[in-house]
A protein has these predicted regions:
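Generic enzyme active-site microenvironment
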Residues: 157, 296, 374, 427-428
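Active-site diphosphate/adenylate-binding microenvironment
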Residues: 6-10, 14-18, 32-39, 340-415
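N-terminal alpha/beta PP-like core and its mobile active-site loop of ThDP/TPP-dependent enzymes
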Residues: 1-328, 366-369, 449-452, 470-472, ...
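Short, internal active-site loops enriched in acidic
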Residues: 162-165, 380, 528
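Thiamine diphosphate
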Residues: 98, 106-107, 112-113, 305-307, ...
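Short acidic loop-to-helix transition motifs that present clustered carboxylates
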Residues: 29, 50-55, 380-382, 502-506
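Conserved structured core elements
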Residues: 26, 214, 316-319, 353, ...
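Phosphate/pyrophosphate-binding active-site segments
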Residues: 171-173, 191-195, 291-377, 503-507, ...
Length: 548
């Protein structure tokens, strides 16, 4: 069928089952936007900034497991996507970024709004295409979807010069792109791991974000319960195993639950399931699981021995690997080890700062751990990881690897549109809110029912906390004293504004906000001296943790 590059792009998006795209138009994507105008099967969400559009595509992907799509024009439009693309790359989230560019004949001439965006994004994408007339736009976009979902998921960029979008292209409908099949785990690797597990007296499962992106949660639950092995999660792994489960120990790492960290310190076998041993969890082998043999299961061989040297590696799909290992082993008991962990919990209870704990525990109870919980970055993020009880996978959407402030608002828009049947709540700080508050206009325009909870302490809390602990209280540039009336700002955008002046008001305010089928912003006041605790100092371990 005779078509154009722009029309072929839209047709391939329809092939892939895309129903929502996020973006911002410009001169280099006029042909693409003209075809979008003619298409009534794809909803376009116009954000106020391209970075928010990229975060929205990412939030959509994380909430649904499907590939998110973002479109931007050339030059500054494309470069504004980079932070969002990098956030998706660091957390293995599948998005396809479509950018326009100047005509092919002008590439390399420093033309108006020309940027080599394929080159710029090469370090933070799985692959970057520059569409050409020889291959055709359709083939590039199909491959982009396949690459984004294959193996370790991640972002792919397709840069389409304006003349390629406008020129004639033959289009033939094709089936939806399928990800490449994951490698089957090697029998010898499985047998070695099974032998190590049979000998272990104090095993611990350390779960990362790979358990969620691979859909391995059910296999993980079956594996842990059959073998009676306790489970600790990185922040990205939260939700992969229910917080209410008996074997769940909580968050592990710098701000982790003391019981989870003590279990890591004392275990004799650590099974890393889809985890990358981030320095926020494992600063070194000497400080993290120093007594343990380590089995590392991952779909990406590049993760093996990158941060922590392991004793056994299993390359392959996590769910299939856990199923095969479970079938090779008899049921476990580990009663003595679980008794030790119970003693850890009794001896070192986790800190519960009144305001953050009360606010987030109340929210967790009201939503029963089932909401789409999106966070920004900083203290708000860590308090959420500590005190909200996640009961299902894909319920926490946060910028873990990149730690991008301003991530939350865009990601919440994407999550709410991707999973409208679940309530979406954004937990942000006043710093992240100020970075992205223009997207209140997007919430208002499309009536996207996100509850935005601003943990408002009037400071850049996490950096200020470090300055207090490690820099003798020299608060350099972390006390902006903006004095913004956040509820009034929300009202100016046509969004309902509410306030929590005291944590005792949280239940009443949350009940009202959650009952509304429209966006709401809640200004929740927090003492600026309220810290994220415990806190393991850089280079330290659980024995050097700060508790007050």
């Amino acid at each position: 069928m005779n078509s154009t590059g722009a029309r072929a792009l839209i047709d391939v998006l329809l092939e892939q089952g895309v129903d929502t795209v996020f973006g911002y138009p410009g001169s280099a994507v006029l042909d693409i936007y003209d075809e979008l105008y003619k298409c009534d099967k794809i909803r376009h969400i116009l954000t106020c900034h391209e970075q928010a559009a990229a975060h929205a595509a990412d939030g959509y992907a994380r909430a649904t497991g499907r590939t998110g799509v973002v479109i931007a024009t050339s030059g500054p439009g494309a470069t504004n996507l980079v932070t969002g693309i990098a956030a998706a790359y660091m957390d293995s989230s599948p998005i396809v970024a479509i950018t326009g560019n100047v005509k092919t004949s002008l590439l390399g001439s420093d033309s108006f709004q020309e940027v080599d965006i394929a080159g710029v994004t090469m370090p933070v994408t799985k692959y970057s295409f520059i569409a050409s007339g020889e291959r055709g736009v359709a083939q590039d976009v199909r491959e982009a979807f396949s690459i984004a979902q294959s193996g370790r998921k991640g972002p792919v960029l397709v840069d389409i010069p304006a003349d390629i979008a406008a020129q004639s292209e033959e289009y033939e409908r094709a089936p939806k792109s399928e990800p490449a099949p994951a490698k089957e785990p090697e029998k010898a690797e499985l047998e070695r791991a099974a032998q190590m597990m049979e000998k272990a007296k104090r095993p611990l499962i350390y779960v990362g974000g790979g358990a969620i992106s691979s859909g391995a949660s059910d296999a993980l639950k079956t594996f842990a319960q059959k073998l009676h092995i306790p489970v600790a999660c990185s922040m990205m792994g939260l939700g992969a195993y229910p917080c209410s489960a008996e074997l769940f120990l909580g968050l592990v790492g710098m701000h982790g639950n003391p019981a989870a960290n003590m279990a890591a310190l004392n275990c004799d076998l650590l099974i890393a399931a889809g985890a990358r041993f981030s320095n926020r969890v494992a600063a070194s082998k000497e400080s993290f699981a120093p007594k343990a043999k380590i089995i590392h299961i991952d779909i990406d061989a590049a993760e093996f021995d990158k941060n922590i040297i392991s004793d056994a590696h299993i390359l392959g799909d996590l769910g299939k690997t856990l199923e095969k290992l479970s079938a090779m082993l008899p049921p476990g008991e580990n009663s003595e080890w679980l008794g030790e962990i119970a003693e850890f919990k009794r001896r070192i209870p986790r800190p519960k700062p009144y305001a953050p704990y009360t606010v987030l525990h109340t929210l967790s109870e009201l939503t029963k751990g089932e909401a789409n919980i999106v966070t920004d970055v900083g203290q708000n993020q860590m308090w959420t990881a500590q005190y909200y009880d996640f009961e299902r996978p894909r319920s926490l959407i946060t910028s873990g690897g990149l730690g991008a402030m301003g991530f939350g608002m865009g990601a919440a828009i994407g999550a709410a549109l991707g999973k409208p049947e679940r309530k979406t709540v954004l937990i942000t700080g006043d710093g992240g809110f100020h970075m992205s508050l223009s997207e209140l206009a997007t919430l208002s325009r499309y009536n996207i029912p996100v509850v935005v909870v601003v943990m408002n302490n009037g400071v850049l809390g996490m950096v200020r906390q470090w300055q207090k602990v490690f820099y003798d209280g020299r608060f350099s540039a972390t006390q902006p004293e903006r004095g913004t009336d956040i509820a009034a700002v929300a009202k100016a955008f046509g969004v309902k504004g509410m306030r929590i002046k005291n944590p005792s008001q949280a239940k009443r305010v949350f009940k009202k906000a959650l009952s509304m089928d429209k966006p709401v912003v809640i200004d929740c006041r927090i003492d600026p001296d309220c810290a994220v605790l415990p806190m393991i100092p850089p280079g330290g371990d659980i024995t050097t943790a700060i508790y007050k």
